[in-house]
From Swiss-Prot:
Record-linked HAMAP family: Malate_dehydrog_3
GO biological process: carboxylic acid metabolic process; tricarboxylic acid cycle
Annotated function: Catalyzes the reversible oxidation of malate to oxaloacetate.
Name of the featured protein: Malate dehydrogenase
Keyword Transferase set for record: no
Annotated family: Belongs to the LDH/MDH superfamily. MDH type 3 family.
GO MF annotations, alphabetized: L-malate dehydrogenase (NAD+) activity
GO CC annotation, single: cytoplasm
Key words, A-Z: NAD, Oxidoreductase, Tricarboxylic acid cycle
Pfam families, sorted: Ldh_1_C, Ldh_1_N
EC number(s) on file: 1.1.1.37
Annotated active site: 176 (proton acceptor)
Originating species: Geobacter sulfurreducens (strain ATCC 51573 / DSM 12127 / PCA)
């Protein structure tokens, strides 16, 4: 049986980590594409030379030609300029739109049967543009944001409560921006509501809410926190890990429920836009969008987040 093939578009920080993670997990053979000559070739050579030490056995190829992505099962797109301190994700839209259009044309021509996972920012606009240019079915073009945002939320909860991140369940909805919706009511530790644990820790609902509000705010601004510390770019380890979780669920038909930037056609009251919602990811890409009830406060936050997404995406038209 032929090995799976993963194409990574963009040989920067995220692309390099993606290539390494694909190799370490032996998800399939890897093609790393970048327009800069030598960059993807050098990174793939470096990773390949670690294979005897780490014990993985896959083929890694760096390239400057889209022809080499032919036959890819999954394409992960990271190409685009990263954020610098003081920039929002939305500030990148003009330059990254041009890059995404070129990338999507390459994918359409050489990997017409692939599943596409977009990481490039501003995410909600870039995944919309990628689908539009490729013309691929909506279930085959998705965006990575919610897995990362949810992981950040879970991390902060685990730190606050002094528990393993493995036992924290947390999820965000909406756009990948400052108006994202971390779902406090559904956050839990081994099924125990986080708010109840915070109330027990601090002895009052008021203090528990104050602490949770701080974690929600930190989650919304977490990407900018990393950008401010790095000063030269944006996060790359956690976005790569998040995209790999999505790719693995598709390649192995795991049917994991993962927050995914998906095209909505009436779900959650949204029609015709890519928005972050929980989805079942399997061999058909998005196999199911999971809807559930939001209370009035959650719905208001979701409406605000969706409005921000619409404003951003409509600026492309």
């Amino acid at each position: 049986m032929a090995r799976k093939k993963i194409a990574l578009i963009g040989g920067g920080q995220i692309g390099g980590v993606l290539a390494q993670l694909c190799a370490l997990r032996e998800l399939g053979d890897v093609v790393l594409f970048d327009i800069v000559e030598g960059l993807p070739q050098g990174k793939c050579l470096d990773i390949a030379e670690a294979s005897p030490v780490d014990g993985f056995d896959v083929c890694l190829k760096g390239t400057n030609s889209y022809e080499d992505i032919a036959g890819a099962d999954v394409v992960i797109v990271t190409a685009g300029l990263p954020r610098k301190p003081g920039m929002s994700r939305d500030d990148l839209i003009e330059v990254n739109s041009k890059i995404m259009t070129s990338v999507a044309e390459g994918i359409k021509q050489y990997a017409p049967n692939s599943f596409v996972i977009v990481i490039s920012n501003p995410l909600d606009a870039m995944v919309t543009l990628c689908q539009k240019v490729t013309g691929f079915p909506y279930n085959r073009v998705i965006g990575q944001a919610g897995v990362l945002d949810s992981a950040r939320f879970a991390t902060f909860i685990a730190w606050e409560l002094g528990v393993s991140v493995k036992d924290v369940t947390a999820m965000t909805l909406g756009g990948h921006g400052d108006d994202m919706v971390p779902l406090v009511r559904y956050a839990s530790v081994k099924g125990i509501p986080v708010m109840e644990l915070l109330e027990r820790k601090y002895g009052s609902k008021e203090k528990a809410k104050e602490v949770m509000d701080a974690m929600v705010n930190r989650t919304r601004l977490a990407g900018g926190e990393v950008v401010a510390l790095l000063k030269t770019g944006s996060a790359f380890y956690s976005p790569a890990s998040s995209a790999i979780a999505m790719a693995e669920s598709i390649l192995k038909d795991q049917k994991r429920v993962l927050p995914t930037c998906a095209y909505l056609q009436g779900e959650f009251g949204v029609n015709g836009y890519y928005v972050g919602v929980p989805c079942v990811l399997g061999e058909k890409g998005i196999e199911n969008i999971i809807e559930f009830s939001l209370d009035a406060e959650e719905q208001a936050m979701m409406d605000k987040s969706v409005a921000a997404v619409k404003s951003l995406v409509d600026s492309l038209k």
